Swiss-Prot record:
Subcellular location: Cytoplasm
NCBIfam families: ftsZ (TIGR00065)
One function term, GO molecular function aspect: GTPase activity
Protein name: Cell division protein FtsZ 2
Keywords: Cell cycle, Cell division, Cytoplasm, GTP-binding, Nucleotide-binding, Septation
Binding site for GTP: 47-51, 134-136, 165, 168, 211
PROSITE patterns per record: FTSZ_1, FTSZ_2
Subunit and partners: Homodimer. Polymerizes to form a dynamic ring structure in a strictly GTP-dependent manner. Interacts directly with several other division proteins.
Function: Essential cell division protein that forms a contractile ring structure (Z ring) at the future cell division site. The regulation of the ring assembly controls the timing and the location of cell division. One of the functions of the FtsZ ring is to recruit other cell division proteins to the septum to produce a new cell wall between the dividing cells. Binds GTP and shows GTPase activity.
One GO CC term, this protein: cytoplasm
Length: 380
């Protein structure tokens, strides 16, 4: 008996053979690795930024690379990060920026070639730093600018100093103003609001709370993009909300099994009334809502939380939300809402001009040097 192929059958067989061959080839593996996955990088600048990177490494983060940058060699050596870069080695001799943002800026500019190499091809870059010091305030805008020039969506995540740190506040205003110029969105954690959130904690522990909030926010956004979740956030959606988002604030809410009543309503109310979110969010341009819950979190609950926060915002606001399951959060729900396009006159918008203070550096000293010692990948 002779079996007759028709054209349609022949095409199907050929396509199947080609598909099977490609599935075993290096080409397909390359395509799977290089396409369809956003490259996310988290860069911590200065002492506070390094501490956030260290905390991220401690709690673990999937789908992102971490880079720690500092002028303080001693601090940098004890930080955990995928890559560590000591900047301004000939400028500061690894001893820090002395609280001068202009030194931090100059140190980062001396390292631009290395920064470009490390950030090339990144789709989303978080730049985290404490505003008001030297290295973070000065270097973070340079890092953000390099990332932006390489085509990434750049999200600054910065802390604003306590009022008792008077010498740092003016520098912080200058740093945030500069970050606002070079980032798509700048998320601000006001340390003064931490006093309302955790009023009885010693100040050193309050700093750790800020590290934890930033680390959890970055981890949450990253893993909801990169890791299969209950409800994934698409990178294109993140880009739409964060691109040109301006100044952003963050609201945090959490409920557990001991909370009485409707836990969905409770966590929505707690998130929007969070002391860190001390702005009029109703006129916000957009929001990114991240929900984490235990295995008992239902799809309906996640949807109701997303809708509950969305309805409180401007009807024209671009809102995206995602949800993921954490086996260790049985009975609990945590929500982080990043509200973009808000106005916070107490922090942003002051007319400030940075004072330029840079020690003189010889031409020989300013030449770039790279080597790996003491766990540091690059010394520049």
């Amino acid at each position: 008996m002779i079996y007759k192929f028709n054209i349609r059958n022949l095409r199907m067989i050929i396509m199947k053979l080609v598909k099977d061959a490609l599935s075993r080839s290096d080409t397909t593996r390359y395509l799977k690795d290089e396409f369809g996955e956003a490259r996310i990088v988290v860069v911590g600048c200065g002492g506070a930024g390094n501490n956030t990177i260290n905390r991220l490494m401690e709690i673990g983060i999937q789908g992102a690379e971490t880079i720690a940058i500092n002028t303080d060699k001693q601090h940098l050596e004890v930080i955990q990060a995928d890559k560590k870069i000591l900047i301004g080695a000939t400028l500061t001799r690894g001893l820090g920026a002395g609280g001068y943002p202009e030194i931090g800026r100059k140190a980062a500019e001396m390292a631009k070639n290395i920064l470009e190499e490390q950030l090339k091809g990144a789709d989303l870059v978080f730049v985290t730093a404490g505003m008001g010091g030297g290295t973070g305030t000065g270097s973070a805008p340079v890092v953000a600018e390099v990332a932006k020039e390489n085509g990434a969506i750049v999200v600054g995540v910065v802390t604003y100093p306590f009022k008792i740190e008077r010498a740092r506040m003016k520098k912080a205003d200058e740093g945030i103003a500069r970050m606002s110029e070079v980032c798509d969105t700048v998320i601000i954690i006001d340390n003064n609001k931490l006093l309302d959130l955790v009023p009885n904690l010693p100040i050193n522990d309050a700093f750790k709370v800020a590290d934890e909030i930033i680390a959890q926010a970055v981890k949450g956004i990253t893993e909801t993009i990169a890791v299969p979740s209950l409800i994934n956030i698409d990178f294109a959606d993140v880009k739409a909300v964060m691109s040109g988002g301006g100044v952003a604030m963050i609201g945090v809410g959490e409920v557990d099994s001991s909370d009485r009543g409707d836990r969905v309503q409770n966590v929505v109310r707690e998130t929007l009334s969070c002391p860190l979110l001390d702005v009029d969010y109703r006129g916000a341009k957009g929001a990114l809502i991240h929900i984490t819950g235990g295995p008992d979190l239902t799809l309906k609950e996640a949807n109701d939380i997303g809708e509950g926060i969305t309805k409180e915002l401007d009807p024209e606001a671009n809102v995206i939300w995602g949800a993921r399951i954490d086996p260790e959060m049985e009975g609990c729900i945590r929500v982080m809402a990043i509200i973009t396009g808000v106005k916070s006159p107490n922090i942003v918008g002051k007319d400030t001009k940075p004072k330029r203070i840079i020690p003189k550096v010889s031409k020989e000293q300013s030449q770039r040097k790279e080597r790996k010692i003491g766990g540091i990948d690059f010394i520049v």
